[in-house]
Amino acid sequence: MALSVDSSWHRWQWRVRDGFPHCPSETTPLLSPEKGRQSYNLTQQRVVFPNNSIFHQDWEEVSRRYPGNRTCTTKYTLFTFLPRNLFEQFHRWANLYFLFLVILNWMPSMEVFHREITMLPLAIVLFVIMIKDGMEDFKRHRFDKAINCSNIRIYERKEQTYVQKCWKDVRVGDFIQMKCNEIVPADILLLFSSDPNGICHLETASLDGETNLKQRCVVKGFSQQEVQFEPELFHNTIVCEKPNNHLNKFKGYMEHPDQTRTGFGCESLLLRGCTIRNTEMAVGIVIYAGHETKAMLNNSGPRYKRSKIERRMNIDIFFCIGILILMCLIGAVGHSIWNGTFEEHPPFDVPDANGSFLPSALGGFYMFLTMIILLQVLIPISLYVSIELVKLGQVFFLSNDLDLYDEETDLSIQCRALNIAEDLGQIQYIFSDKTGTLTENKMVFRRCTIMGSEYSHQENAKRLETPKELDSDGEEWTQYQCLSFSARWAQDPATMRSQKGAQPLRRSQSARVPIQGHYRQRSMGHRESSQPPVAFSSSIEKDVTPDKNLLTKVRDAALWLETLSDSRPAKASLSTTSSIADFFLALTICNSVMVSTTTEPRQRVTIKPSSKALGTSLEKIQQLFQKLKLLSLSQSFSSTAPSDTDLGESLGANVATTDSDERDDASVCSGGDSTDDGGYRSSMWDQGDILESGSGTSLEEALEAPATDLARPEFCYEAESPDEAALVHAAHAYSFTLVSRTPEQVTVRLPQGTCLTFSLLCTLGFDSVRKRMSVVVRHPLTGEIVVYTKGADSVIMDLLEDPACVPDINMEKKLRKIRARTQKHLDLYARDGLRTLCIAKKVVSEEDFRRWASFRREAEASLDNRDELLMETAQHLENQLTLLGATGIEDRLQEGVPDTIATLREAGIQLWVLTGDKQETAVNIAHSCRLLNQTDTVYTINTENQETCESILNCALEELKQFRELQKPDRKLFGFRLPSKTPSITSEAVVPEAGLVIDGKTLNAIFQGKLEKKFLELTQYCRSVLCCRSTPLQKSMIVKLVRDKLRVMTLSIGDGANDVSMIQAADIGIGISGQEGMQAVMSSDFAITRFKHLKKLLLVHGHWCYSRLARMVVYYLYKNVCYVNLLFWYQFFCGFSSSTMIDYWQMIFFNLFFTSLPPLVFGVLDKDISAETLLALPELYKSGQNSECYNLSTFWISMVDAFYQSLICFFIPYLAYKGSDIDVFTFGTPINTISLTTILLHQAMEMKTWTIFHGVVLLGSFLMYFLVSLLYNATCVICNSPTNPYWVMEGQLSNPTFYLVCFLTPVVALLPRYFFLSLQGTCGKSLISKAQKIDKLPPDKRNLEIQSWRSRQRPAPVPEVARPTHHPVSSITGQDFSASTPKSSNPPKRKHVEESVLHEQRCGTECMRDDSCSGDSSAQLSSGEHLLGPNRIMAYSRGQTDMCRCSKRSSHRRSQSSLTI
């Protein structure tokens, strides 16, 4: 749809002539100003006109096309409730089935029961569901009414002021004014914020579950407003994308009156449902309203997954339908045969009105339909309701398991999917993320390398080796220091001098206090408030012990920074001092960390305007700083630094200490900005400038203790990524402190107290494609435009400046040396399991940046291909970088991860790790968590070529197949062993397990080359698979590939947004509540806090849920078939007339009351094996993987047993009462009683756990039957005419035959079942049977039996001869295979390497791991050699054995036999 409106150009000219000022903005001229009318395509974009006097007509024309802000989540109205609810209920085939039977029963020729009685069950079900749906919809109506009537201030055009209105009155284009703690009523574009920096703080917990605050900034050009926003002065048109459900994606542009454009994104959008925090006032214009808001578009309702048991049950239901049809056919044919035996029409065969009789064929068809009505219970429709109730009970007990509760986070397991709990007991493959899932995701700065020099931080390493030194409850040795503004200057000078040396930074976390066995957070601060004492605190490790050697160089670098002048050359030198300064500046600046002080409240507290102490003190401080900045820098360094006491005296009592301060310590730090002749902001001031020489502590003494200056305010850093927070804390340990951050500038405090304010020109955020982040700043001392970049080493190394392009030969050699040594250190860090990041910089000229910024603004203003253009502009800037160094961050393994992985592996579960980390880091973590063992044969494949990948997969697969052939037992014929082509190994010998390590590029080659089948076949021989450098899309593709091709049950577990696709692709998705937000949790089926909880969740609760539900389903199917067959056998004695010997009300009560509760209790509370035994014997989990409790054989065995029991229950009473003159109901009552007794006793035999509740339910059901029968038979005189069951039960209770039959028949009926269960328990070889025997033993004997079991199950040690030999691979012509690291930049050498040489190289590398790193060694083999070498069993030589021992001593992280291709 094209919409043509008057452009605001002419109206703007008219307004300018009347004296209205022009609103300045950062724009790019893209449109011609001569055009008087502008055309917009409303089908592809959204156009928003402001609701003010100038655009009133355009707003009226456009806004009526958009929905209002009134929301309605109800499904019904008062008039549509009854018909629509019935229509929805009859969409279920079960209700249609019952309705079909009711209609059939209303036909006179097919009537079996009373018509009203047949309608009653269906009517009750429909009525109950209708009441439930009505109550739920009424609750939604009340909620909608409360939301729609919430108050908000909307700008009224006629009154030209903000008016209090309801949310439902908001329209697209309205101006909305919001205050602190108010909820955003619609999706609003932020135009004004009371924050002087144009920032609005949001809490998005209602959308994504994250409690940390988010920053939103006003649109460019509106951030410098010093007065209130005036809607009448807004003369811009907004064009943006159509409504969608992407919470983190938004793009559009603002067209100004001069037809220039300013682009904006999601950083300026306030989403509906968020809460304004720490911002007194925010004003914006409504972009999306009502059901078009992103929050409403994301309310798609709960996802429905069908469990494996339910899929199996649906198949068996079709078998039951087949049985029903067969029985009805027998009844129809039998009825025709029976009628054919009469030579004349019998008296009960009544003719129609014309006196004619039905033909035999038509009579048989009617009888077929009549038999369906009679045997309808054979289809267990109530089974679905029972299953839902059982699942609710299982989830209830699962959610209340204290073992799955995490004290640190105060969170327990969340069951977000109620219908797949039983699938937890059948998992065969687990796909896990690494960071935050296997590891803590609490990053700790471990070591770094700068300009090729490595700083190991040994003191930091020793401290970190102490397990959870700072996290233990009894060793909490720090207290939260709540420092006010005045405390910054209040410390005694002697305190500073006594704190010399490098000391670790103390944490400012709250102490944990035990309360009745559970831990809760107790504030240790002095400030009494309901809010947390630490605003925006992140649960990350902040303790860093500086390296003494690096600390000295940092001090020199800080002093060097002070000597810089405006004449600094454009091309920075590669000196160590300057590089160290730039390195720590990059750590401090290149991030998106939010800064606050520990005393900053969560919600802003306002003070009365009469309080002028704050303004007076700030004005004096600013005047003092302006005067002091006139001093020379050299004078400031020749003088000594001031003491805190003296500085406090000089400032006097004007320093504000109130918590309601509008400016925190960070704003005070940056209070002395000025503008020099160069046109850039030089924001640098020194604490030493404000006092005379000789007063207080010297600068040298201050630099000696950069990490212990407790007099300075304690800053809290809130980071989106734990990596960023760890780097900022590491820089803070060296006194490069991030003081404040705004959209316009970043302030950094140097070790000597000097504050530098960098103008923030542009921020290129991190994304999974670029794998890096950059900031463009203007240096306050030199005026240079500097690009600081950090990112993955695999990306940064390719973006560095080519040393060959450097004209200076010495500089070229130096660059190559730095690059090689940094890569060497990166490999060392990776082998130590550290996360690596490279730091680089680039100096950009003014002209280049101006040209690039113009392209960037055009990309931001683009609507169609905005993301592609932004990516392209980022790539144009992030190149020709200068390497500064790299960091190694430790991400500790979570507690219990190695034990959990080992246990899951014993349970027969294949574990794959899909991570985006580099290969060396992932492999190291895999060894640490026992995913890969020392004796594993590890295949590492790194290639981008499809042909090479196929050859490698074929050869590796061939070798593994041959080694598996060695494990097969010898073939025998009549007791004689047949000759074998390959030599066999002894039965005690075990061939080592294989592991596969593969990277993202190889995965691309596999998916693009149609090699998925070979890849999966290879993984079948591997115990563990490790996919490194994998993207979120690759993760989901792998999960779908394994799930669909192998037809196995899969589980994915992760904690980050990049794991969402993988979690949703698996049969069961588990999210971990970690440090990376709640997106993984919100998209998961279950949410846990620790990976170790997965062990009990699967092995115990998974086994129980599967075993209970599977056996309950089998029992339910058996119960219905057994009972219905009683009616079927009776048809052989009533001429297949569809008569019954049991009263119809008794039949209804049988399923409704008498046998409904025991299966529910059985499905919720039964425990076939105790939790302790299940955890001690993980092999028991394989019973669920193999579907031993419920499969095709168990179904048919139960069906045969049901037919047998029904035969016994019918024919023993028949023979007992044969020849007597009892009536039909007197004959049916014993059969009904016997059937109930047999079914309940069958249930009792299946129960493995007996409690008082079980006994009460079974006995109560049995007694209820007699109680209801006695009352019904005593009161029902004419209720079921003509055959009323009056006094039938009372008469049977006085008949001895009744007692004899009721006692003897169940025993005979259950004898085969009892014999089968006894034989299974005595001679059965299943693991479950053996475990049940062990479970019944006393605790001491049970523990001994479990130990004996585990000793028998433990595999034998791997003999020397059983280890496979690996030879280097012959390549296809022109292909290379790296024998060590995949990042080899040297040309490959064509040579042949024997097994011993490869093994020696590996062992030697491990023995010298701390001294050097493996170099770039590549090997390309001759075309005549085999890819993996010949497969043969060979004894290791003495030298090789010694080398193996060397490998064992040197590192536990390496495998005994590995091959990198």
From Swiss-Prot:
Effect of residue 865 to K: Found in patients with early-onset Parkinson disease; uncertain significance; impaired ATPase flippase activity
Annotated phenotype, changing residue 993 to A: Found in a patient with early-onset Parkinson disease; uncertain significance; impaired ATPase flippase activity
Annotated consequence of substituting residue 161 to N: Found in patients with early-onset Parkinson disease; uncertain significance; impaired ATPase flippase activity
Primary location recorded for the protein, binned into one broad class: membrane
GO cellular component, one term: plasma membrane
GO process terms (BP): lysosomal membrane organization; phospholipid translocation
Record InterPro entries: ATPase_P-typ_cyto_dom_N, ATPase_P-typ_P_site, ATPase_P-typ_TM_dom_sf, ATPase_P-typ_transduc_dom_A_sf, HAD-like_sf, HAD_sf, P-type_ATPase_IV, P-type_ATPase_N
Example of a GO MF term: ATPase-coupled intramembrane lipid transporter activity
Subcellular location as annotated: Late endosome membrane; Lysosome membrane; Endoplasmic reticulum membrane
Cytoplasmic membrane side: 1-82, 133-316, 391-1111, 1165-1194, 1247-1252, 1317-1461
Protein name: Phospholipid-transporting ATPase VB
Organism field: Homo sapiens (Human)
